[in-house]
Amino acid sequence: MSYNRLGDPYGEEDSHTPMMNPHHLDARSPSPGRPLNAYQLSDNPYAPREHLEMPSSDRLAEQPTYSVERLPNSYGHNEVYEDHHHPNAYPGYEYSLDPEAHHDAYYTQPYQPAVTPHEDYDLGQYPEHQQSYTDDRVPILQPDNPFGPDPYADEYEEEPTIAPTPSPAPVRRWKTVKEVQLFNGNLVLDCPIAPALLSQVPHAEPPGRDEFTHMRYSAATCDPADFFEERFTLRQKLFAKPRHTELFIAVTMYNEDDFLFARTMIGVFKNIEYMCSRTSSKTWGKDAWKKIVVCVISDGRAKINPRTRAVLAGLGCYQDGIAKQQVNGKDVTAHIYEYTTQVGLELKGGQVSLKPRTGCPVQMIFCLKEKNQKKINSHRWFFQAFGRVLDPNICVLLDAGTRPGKDSIYHLWKAFDVDPMCGGACGEIKVMLSHGKKLLNPLVAGQNFEYKLSNILDKPLESAFGFISVLPGAFSAYRYVALQNDKNGQGPLERYFLGEKMHGANAGIFTANMYLAEDRILCFEIVSKRNCRWLLRYVKSSNGETDVPDRMAEFILQRRRWLNGSFFAAVYAIAHFYQIWRSDHSFMRKFMLFIEFIYQTINMLFAWFGIGNFFLVFHILTAYLGDDDLLGTVGKVLGVVFEWLYLATLVTCFVLALGNRPGGSNKFYMTMVYFWIGIMIYLAFAAVFVTVKSIQSQVQQNGFTFSDLFTNYQFFSIIVSLGSTYVMWFLASFIFMDPWHMFTSFIQYILLTPTYINVLNIYAFCNTHDITWGTKGDDKAEKLPSANLKPGGKVDVNIPQDDGDLNAQYEAELAKFANKPPKEENIVSEEDRQADYYKGFRSAVVLVWVFCNFALAAVVLSAAGLEEFSSDQETTENTRATIYMAVVLWSVAGLSLFKFLGAMWFLTVRMFRGV
């Protein structure tokens, strides 16, 4: 059952009965930590609202737009006709043909900030419910005769059009000036779809029109937070019975190509088809698509990939030449295109192609931001602008390039449906392996193992407690009401959107780094929300596939942002843990969250001391090999050599991280990766060799019994602790019925562990000053025409006029992605190449200087391992080293056991919950 905060009578989902409405929570059974009372105390600053109240029907009624159809029905399009044919102010439908009839009642009343801008409409003038209201496919603008006079009739005389002013650039044939009226300064147009596209999909027969025959364009001239107050609206609220949006899906993109975009959209389309196929569901079913809106938000008009934009045009969600730079002197901040598409996508050999889809349309919003303002600003448009209008139940966040499973979005939604206290959820993020081919790259295999282990141990553990430290922005979902701020303007979204202002002098460096992982801040704020009891859940049944870096330079840059953001966000969450006590969670839940924060603190401490811990383990193991019973002098020599190389490589990491670009130092970094792999192989050999020798010595002296495995200190400290960790990894993977990564990626991950600890951590902490997302500054976009106000409240717009012109424009867009794109080459500019050369020379000089002085000090002081060749060694040093080794390794084993128990609890709960 879906929770509809507006009170619409939506039924239950399948056989589940928990109600999402806080007034009906007594329908579920009580459970520990979930008493039968409201999941959120009454603290909603906004009363339930409607936008453009309409009669109770599902008919697409007239809306404050003007058609740019070539047919002269719109106000200002054919004044000769209007002078001789005065329309009836109250026709058989809701609106008159002449907007002046509604001018005073609808558009010129003084705006009162205390009242919702869409609530001042008189409903008394509307007729009673009619049978025709149930038809979705009715005119968007529909007077008695929706299109005015028949342009092909004998008595029709078309008014001459005004040619545009000549310009040096070639003028497109289809651009013709039309006059349209602005509503409260807002330019909104209904643009006809190209006949070439329209002929492939079901739609209203002429002269009718519907959401399939026209695309709606809005030129937003405001900040996202003011979108609702500036009286902008969306199609879903313009039906005679406004459509309830149960699922609002955001797809954010920057400059992703058409292949990545199509991969995501194909996954979204399949999920919508799946929900439409659930005919026995009381929430979904045949018309499920009417409750789902997909919003594609592109970060910057100059940044969008032209092939991706062409794919959107192929879907009917974009038309070239419609957008404006300014409206009435106000800069346009976002271009919003709305269309219900019935066109599908498919990928063949790395190429995108269109295919007709039947029975399951998709309501789409394409928001093309004028400027590049980063991903968090895109989410402001999604939540503050469009979410405020649509008032959805569940919001799903996707990155372009992430492909959700065919029913993954449904399973995410289901988690909210069965648990009224679920405020956020995420699925499993999988590495896209191309049928295993990418596993040949050790870097990809290592990341695959890392992702799998997180989904098997970390996420289930955190879900069992109710707080997941991060819901990945690439694929996650939130309950819209859980995100809302309180009446004082404080809450999850307020904290989340602070990240947009965290630049330069506006924020400290700690806060700026913290907001590199703003999704972690959002998770903490939801769980600790004042007077609420929201929880975060992991949904194993849901998954999304994504690409991972396959080159070292890209990998380092990605992890720099991840590591810095997650570390500082974890510090923030731990330092503000006390805010959990202001929430309305039960005492038991608060205690569980307290235990989880202790666990998070221990993890953070291990991350902070990661470099030191790894070096000490290396030093102790190599020192063991120098014993006379093991390798003797050979072990001592190898230990000193490896220790010098280890420290030299570590210093090189620091020098490169402080001054060099990873892309310009790729050879250095790859050399270090190979060295760390060699170190890991040597450590593995040392651990096994030391253990075997210690067991052999035990057998020769006293014989062998099973208890000797636990009394032999070296064996117990090394093999049992490490072995138990790896055995738990295998066991958990088999229990979760997902063990293949243990056979295909385990060795690669183990070999890359020193690289993760040393290279990535050093680069991240040496670049805490860099708070960028790795994107460059704005490119200059092509300047668009402006819409300037004329006497009478009208503006001139350039519009497509002719079926042939519309088809030509549509086919030109299709041609942009008809062929495979040229293979991308990373071309380094001459400036970057010269800068890399200078920095490389500087780093080489610094390294030679440091190593020469270090060698001099080591030789003079007999330090840095040279003392190993002396016969005078203290046994206490070995004792301390052994104790330290045991503490570190058993701590690792204990943490793994803790994760394992949490994962088992998650599976137990999942057996009864069904999600």
UniProtKB/Swiss-Prot annotation:
Gene disruption phenotype: Leads to elevated spore production.
GO terms for biological process, alphabetical: ascospore wall assembly; chitin biosynthetic process; septum digestion after cytokinesis
Compartments where found: Cell membrane
Entry's transmembrane regions: 561-581, 605-625, 637-657, 672-692, 715-735, 844-864, 887-907
EC number: 2.4.1.16
Catalyzed chemical reaction(s): [(1->4)-N-acetyl-beta-D-glucosaminyl](n) + UDP-N-acetyl-alpha-D-glucosamine = [(1->4)-N-acetyl-beta-D-glucosaminyl](n+1) + UDP + H(+)
Family: Belongs to the chitin synthase family. Class I subfamily.
PANTHER family assigned to the protein according to its UniProt record, in alphabetical order: CHITIN SYNTHASE, CHITIN SYNTHASE 1
Name assigned to this protein: Chitin synthase A
Species per Swiss-Prot/TrEMBL record: Aspergillus niger (strain ATCC MYA-4892 / CBS 513.88 / FGSC A1513)
Lineage, uppermost ranks: Eukaryota, Fungi, Dikarya, Ascomycota, Pezizomycotina
